[in-house]
């Protein structure tokens, strides 16, 4: 279990998919910080949580191509987004998948998918990330502060409010 802090404009009694949001040009999820003072700068309500995270999105290695295809195929904005790649849907899938895979790391690839295929649908993004067995991504900021973007609300246990 990992200790983290949530901050927001309102008090939260439990975490659900309604808490999933977009965060500063990132993947969609529930945002936590590893450091309490940093969390206090983000909002008036701060709570300590424990995160039980099993499978994390890699910030170093590439994603599985089948997972990328799943995320594109099940995206709510799929038809609209695919039109940006080609008029022929089959060709558009190939081009879109190649475009996403050029992101390099799994984290960057899923960030591209979130922005291009799940715009205005953060909850669906999180649910599909859980379907391909990811709980969260952890982003180090070099100053020993880690941001956790959690897809699965079941991984969050509130310690105190």
Model feature map: region roles:
Residues 1-31, 36, 43-161:
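Active-site and NAD+-binding cores of ADP-ribose-processing enzymes
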